[in-house]
């Protein structure tokens, strides 16, 4: 693979989601999956702030066919949740989908019914850039999870075999486990911690938000063209948050290569990002806090982080402490290696698929 092709490949992976970053030196060719588009409209959706929207549109993709057991309940539905700034299509990344969705794979679409939503504020779902700008309701992860559950109700899905969430979706998976106990057979949160976002994590998010708000061109969110400097500075911070040190050093071993790669990546990121949308989805984590009620998560949990995750650094020791509070949870810390990709390891399914295979066998419902 040429260096130019390598850079294009990694840029595409990085841009699959702002924090949902998957860096790679090589990847299988993308497959064309028979994804079916769907949309539900939730009327008079009320947010945790008390704000409401007359109509909240939620877009999603599905793969496979739903199946119902003898009691009439869905028994093969899998909910896959994307990261901050991503969308349903980001989980069609070949590093993820080629490993998991094909014939005989762990989430073979001939066996499972995969549901990939665009979260509030993302993709083709309702978001600030649709027109409300900073008057859009200030959604948070609780709102997102509640809307996901309402979407499933509209789809007539009354049970899930698995919820697998990456990054933001990882945090939402913990919220699911507390809020809708028993709705899923198994929970797989990848690349997060079940505690409030504070310390360096919140500082970096706050810096990204303030970079935009402090740009005079932002105009309180009523800009007619993107606030370029503020948006650029925000994307710089987000890039560093999701990067992995080993792969960045391999990719850009000289000063010239490092600067060119960063310039190329940011030019693409800036062209694809709306400033108001970024403010909202980065700030959606502000109220996240499953910590007080972790003991209520009795569903089996497979929780995986990687040692080179800059957003969730293992030296904090939080995961090892918190996993003990969930009665059926297992935490795995994947050591840094040539295979890991920083925070984006959550999308590189080859790294953790064997753990998921064991977990799926262990949680297979008994007849």
Feature locations, PLM:
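Conserved acidic catalytic loop of the alpha/beta-hydrolase fold
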Residues: 142-162
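Conserved hydrolase catalytic core segment
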Residues: 159-201
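Alpha/beta-hydrolase-fold enzymes
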Residues: 183-268
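Conserved alpha/beta-hydrolase "acid-adjacent" motif
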Residues: 310-317
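Catalytic active-site module of serine/aspartate enzymes centered on a nucleophile-bearing elbow/loop
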Residues: 328-367
């Amino acid at each position: 693979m040429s260096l130019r092709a390598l850079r294009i490949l990694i840029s595409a992976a990085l841009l699959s989601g702002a924090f949902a970053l998957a860096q790679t030196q090589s990847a299988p060719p993308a497959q064309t999956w028979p994804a079916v588009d769907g949309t539900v409209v939730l009327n008079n959706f009320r947010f945790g702030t008390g704000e409401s929207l007359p109509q909240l549109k939620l877009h999603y993709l599905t793969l496979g066919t739903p199946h119902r057991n003898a009691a009439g309940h869905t028994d093969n539905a899998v909910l896959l949740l994307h990261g901050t700034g991503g969308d349903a299509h980001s989980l069609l990344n070949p590093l993820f989908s080629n490993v998991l969705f094909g014939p005989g794979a762990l989430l073979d679409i001939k066996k499972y019914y995969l549901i990939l939503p665009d979260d509030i504020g993302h993709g083709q779902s309702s978001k600030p850039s649709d027109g409300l700008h900073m008057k859009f309701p200030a959604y948070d992860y609780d709102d997102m999870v509640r809307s996901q559950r309402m979407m499933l109700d509209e789809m007539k899905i009354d049970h899930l075999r698995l919820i697998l969430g990456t990054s933001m979706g990882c945090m939402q998976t913990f919220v699911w486990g507390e809020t809708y106990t028993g709705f899923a057979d198994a929970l797989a949160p990848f690349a997060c911690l079940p505690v409030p976002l504070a310390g360096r994590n919140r500082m970096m998010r706050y810096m990204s938000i303030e970079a935009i708000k402090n740009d005079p061109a932002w105009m309180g969110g009523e800009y007619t063209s993107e606030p370029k400097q503020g948006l650029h500075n925000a994307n710089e911070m987000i890039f560093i948050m999701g990067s992995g040190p080993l792969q960045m050093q391999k990719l850009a071993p000289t000063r010239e290569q490092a600067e060119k790669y960063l310039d190329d990546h940011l030019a693409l990121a800036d062209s694809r990002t709306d400033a108001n949308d970024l403010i909202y989805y980065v700030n959606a984590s502000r109220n996240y806090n499953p910590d007080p009620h972790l003991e209520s998560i009795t569903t089996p949990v497979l929780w995986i982080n990687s040692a080179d995750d800059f957003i969730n650094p293992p030296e904090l020791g939080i995961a090892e402490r918190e996993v003990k509070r969930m009665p059926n949870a297992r935490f795995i810390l994947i050591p840094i290696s040539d295979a890991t990709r920083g925070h984006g390891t959550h999308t590189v399914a080859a790294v953790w698929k064997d753990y998921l295979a064991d977990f799926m066998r262990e949680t297979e419902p008994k007849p």
